[in-house]
Amino acid sequence: MILLVADSSIRHMGPTLDLQQGDCLELMRAMPANSVDLIATDPPYYKVKGDAWDRQWDTPAAFLAWFDLLAEQWQRILRPNGSLYTFAWPGIAAEVEVLIKRRFNVLQRITWAK
């Protein structure tokens, strides 16, 4: 199993886990095609949080272009019968879903009500 993380506080959790920290696009580009069974991801929301990691795009279009780069890699590395779960802020979720539907067969939208 490979787990890509941005949080440096997460540590190696066992002998079957390859924990990698870094830019997820660079790490995914190095992964073989059709090699992943499940992708569960919580990308930045786009200007919801006050932190720099969530405010690195000037426009929604720039954020969505970056998000589409992620989706391109997910499509490449995910096995044909693999699953993808991604979180999105409600304010931009509709646009994110349009991008996802261009590349994947969306079976269900799950709403997490906190």
Segments (PLM) and residue ranges:
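Core catalytic lobe of class I
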Residues: 2-114
